[in-house]
Structure formats: structure tokens, C-alpha cells
Amino acid sequence: MAQNSLRLVEDKAVDKSKALDAALSQIERAFGKGSIMRLGANEQVVEIETVPTGSLGLDIALGVGGLPRGRIIEIYGPESSGKTTLALHTVAEAQKKGGICAFVDAEHALDPVYARKLGVDLENLLISQPDTGEQALEICDTLVRSGAIDVLVVDSVAALTPRAEIEGEMGDSLPGLQARLMSQALRKLTASISRSNTMVIFINQIRMKIGVMFGSPETTTGGNALKFYASVRLDIRRIGSVKDRDEVVGNQTRVKVVKNKLAPPFKVVEFDIMYGEGVSKTGELVDLGVKAGVVEKSGAWFSYNSQRLGQGRENAKLFLRDNPDTAREIELALRQNAGLIAEKFLENGGSEGGDDGFEDEAGAM
């Protein structure tokens, strides 16, 4: 009796295996070789390629060393918080590696002089200033399908105005039109983005929901589709000013990783964005160095390997700017201590409630 039941189980296993092989061959005949495969059959799972953001702290907070290629990224925040600056830094870093980048300027507000100061190679940057949202997204689709673009920036989702709205009267009510446009475009784009390994960065603005009694009234434009399709969502805020005596020379900026499908989310990092320069790399080296114990702080003095960097943060920044070899040594030490620093980011700001009251989303799916 036991032998009969054992034989029956073996026969069922053989039948299932044959049925699976038949199904796989049928799928490959219908849709082509490679349309379905066993994930670990032939080769190891390839690590995700990333592009640095221009901020060492943010690269560490993202957990994979930068923003991932072949994925959709959303950067949102209030006005003048550094959204476009962060996107342009990413473009500059991609170009340094020989990548081809494109910028869809739906806001018609890109400053080429500022972009050059951030390190963007304007001669090799493709730029489009479309008239309608449909035109902008068709251009994006064509560029992504070409497989030749490494980083594509759309600035911004709020400026992707549907054609019906442009052709209509000023007072016309067209509810949900932009959300439907974004939803359809993302359905088309998502497979092409993965195949072409193109990183698509959508810059987004914040709006207020009317009549919200509990929770944050803030929301992003363009509906909910982008929130779901994005692998990484960054909430960027201006939290203060950087002053040289009485003159304001930059912004203190906080970035929260609200969603991250590649590493634990809710990490918070702070850095300075200097006017005309972009992200202050030397400022980050000082701050992260103190966090990791690489740079020693005694009172107002900062020192590294018993060498004094300066009294006060600004003097330490100036020393590192004038001594690039020391700055390089500190950066190397920080990259080796990346795991320790990432834990500190989570300790400092990683509660799921979000200190800005913005609705957070768990990233690991």
C-alpha cells in the first residue's frame, strides 16, 4: 500500500515536470527565447548599476551607492529646495562616466550657466522644451526605447500640461486629466526603462489637499501612479541658511529617502547647497567624518590624524578645499565606514512617522 502511494507521488512529480517543460516551450515559441527563464539557471544575479548623486551622504543613505539605473526616481519638495540641483548633479556624475543624458524641461526654466557650474557638460546634454504633456512624454518614450540614454530628467511633473487643457478656456474644469496622462505614460514606459537600463528622474512639486483635518495636507501632483512605479522617492527640504557673516551664501538641506525598493528606507541626510556651486562636498566630509569618528571634534576645533583642520566648521571646509589630498583620504575612510554611517542616518531621522508630517511609504517590496 505504501509502495503504491509512493509510486503515485513520483508519477505526479514527473507529470508536473513534463507539463512545466511543455508550458515553457510553448511560451518561448509564442513570445521568443528569453521571455521566461529560471532566475539563477545560467548566470549569477547581476548587481544593480548606480549613478552617484553628487552627495556622498545621500549615496550612503540610499544603501546601494547612488540612484539605480533602469528604474524610475521621484524627487519632490517645496520651491527652491534643491530638486533640480540634485538632478543636475546626477546628470553630471553620469556624464563623467561617459553616459549620455537628456533633460526634458517642461517648466522652460533650466539655467545653462548654473548647470555648467555644477559640472554638467552642456555640449553633450540633450534638451527638449515641449509644448504639451503628451509631447513631453512621447519624447521620453522615444529616448528610452532608443536604449542610448543613461539618465533622463523630467522637470517637472506639475508642468506636464495636457493638450486639452492648453486648447481649452482658462476656467475649464478637467478633473483627473493629468493623473490619467501620467498613469498611461508610466504603464508604457516602465518595461522600456527596465530593458534599456535608463534611469528616469521625475521632479515633482507639492500641493495642499483642502479640508484635511488629520495628518499632513501635503501631496504631490500627477496622481498616485508615480508613487507606485518609482523605485526611489526623495523628499528634499530647505531647513536653514548658510551665512558668511550677514550674507546668505547657501541653503542647509535635508533629504529623506521616503521609499526605497533596493535598501531600507526612511534614512535622513543633511548637507549644504551653496549658491553657484551646488552640494558642498567639503561640508559633507566634515559632518560625515565626525559621525563616523574619522574626523575628531574637540570644542570648536576639527582635526584628522592629529592634523588640525580648523576652528569652526567653515574653516575646516576651507582647509579641505585647499588640501584635496586630505579630503580624498577622508572620503576613502568614509566609504569604508559606509555601513556605520547609514545606521546613524536611520537613528537620526528614520522613524516612519516622518518629521515633516509627509505620508511615508515602506519601500522594500
UniProtKB/Swiss-Prot annotation:
Q: Where in the cell is it found?
A: Cytoplasm
- The residues listed in the UniProt record as binding ATP, with positions renumbered to this chain, are 77-84
The main location is: cytoplasm
A GO BP entry: DNA repair
Q: Which NCBIfam families match?
A: tigrfam_recA
Question: What is the recorded function of this protein according to its Swiss-Prot or TrEMBL entry?
Answer: Can catalyze the hydrolysis of ATP in the presence of single-stranded DNA, the ATP-dependent uptake of single-stranded DNA by duplex DNA, and the ATP-dependent hybridization of homologous single-stranded DNAs. It interacts with LexA causing its activation and leading to its autocatalytic cleavage.
Q: What is this protein called?
A: Protein RecA
Taxonomic source organism:
Mesorhizobium japonicum (strain LMG 29417 / CECT 9101 / MAFF 303099) (Mesorhizobium loti (strain MAFF 303099))
Q: What are the top taxonomic ranks of the organism? A: Bacteria, Pseudomonadati, Pseudomonadota, Alphaproteobacteria, Hyphomicrobiales
